Amino acid sequence: MEFIRRFVGLFILYGRFVLLAVGGYVFTMSSYAFSGKERAELFVSGWRFHLGNPEGDASRQDFDDGAWRLLDLPHDWSIEGDFSADHPARKEGGALPGGLGWYRKVFEAPREWQGKKVFVDFDGVYMNSEVFVNGNSLGVRPYGYSSFRYDLTPYLKWGERNVLAVKVDNSTQPNSRWYSGSGIYRNVWLTVVEPVHVGHWGTFVTTPEVTGEKAVMEVRTMVKNDGQAGRRVGVVSTLLDARGRMVAGQSGFVDVPAGGCSEASHTLIMTAPELWSTEHPYLYKVRTELKVDGRSVDTYYTTTGVRHFKFDARTGFWLNGKHMKINGVCMHHDLGCLGAAVNVRAIKRQLEIIEGDGLQRYPLHA
């Protein structure tokens, strides 16, 4: 993972991989932190898939999908088809078929989850998806390049069989000028939290002041309360170095109304910070812990790097006070003959090639 870490912290993170910019421009403040999914588990194995619109209502819990194909996500059904110039996607869309497909997954919701919140997170579905749980529609997501989340809690049957169904419609062609793929082409996650928890992507970490001697880190945390009563919540922010040792910390309280959210802000100060660079890709973690009545109810980790940079119209780009020439490539998100479904090893190989060519800029074009 070392070669991937050399890209992290300077620019924006995309899913679990890195890109430098969107449209050629860098979007960042002094620091941008990627919040991980430590409380979530991958929800990608044991799905059933059917290409086309089946007879009957495939969203229903009691629908018989026994004859459907068994597979693991991520999945791109277009790459499995035959190439033809007659496909509506045309050569610009890869000359591969689109169409409509269904995915279904059976899972159990343990009784110990009762009283908690259960969410399903989709990192990417192409395109125009509708998600159902036990026959209940959770919503429709247009297009296909944004992650999205649904709350499963009101529809789950505790200690019983539950069914998640996803309809994916990529039949309107052409709809892009590149190969898009079709299906649930990114990971799916199941997140289980207490009613009081850090909100979705609920931490934002910046470093407004960075030198070789000192760094000031601002940590903003959105605390969500899905309970029936207001809560006074203790918020503890702890900065950890790469070995897990405490560097700085601050705590406080926020009052969070029932069904609402409140923001906690902390300032962490470190001396002699390890500055992130392509040669020294050092990463810290911010651990955010929430407490209600002295009991820990949620712990959330945010990975971040500490560095400072500037663009100068005359001299170019500077990182940590050193001049740096930015070289890179522009790529679409698909993996060639492997299709659009994310493949970790294939992306590692891309980054290895990029690094081997002396490049450090990796914007995704979509």
Question: What annotation goes with each model-predicted range?
Answer:
Residues 32-85, 89, 163-167, 171, ...:
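Accessory carbohydrate-binding/adhesion or oligomerization-edge regions at the termini
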Residues 38, 54, 203, 287-356:
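N-terminal carbohydrate-binding accessory modules
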Residues 39, 43, 50-54, 93, ...:
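Accessory beta-strand-rich segments of carbohydrate-active enzymes
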Residues 103-105, 146-150, 252, 260-268:
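Short strand-edge motifs at loop-to-beta-strand transitions and within beta-strands
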Residues 113-117, 156-161, 230, 270-285:
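Short glycine/proline/serine/threonine-rich loop/turn segments at secondary-structure transition edges
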Residues 133, 214-255, 262-266:
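Beta-strand-rich binding/interaction modules
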Residues 166, 237, 286-288:
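Hydrophobic/tyrosine-rich beta-strand signature of extracellular beta-sandwich/beta-rich modules
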Residues 191, 255-256, 303-307:
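Short beta-strand edge segments in extracellular beta-sheet folds
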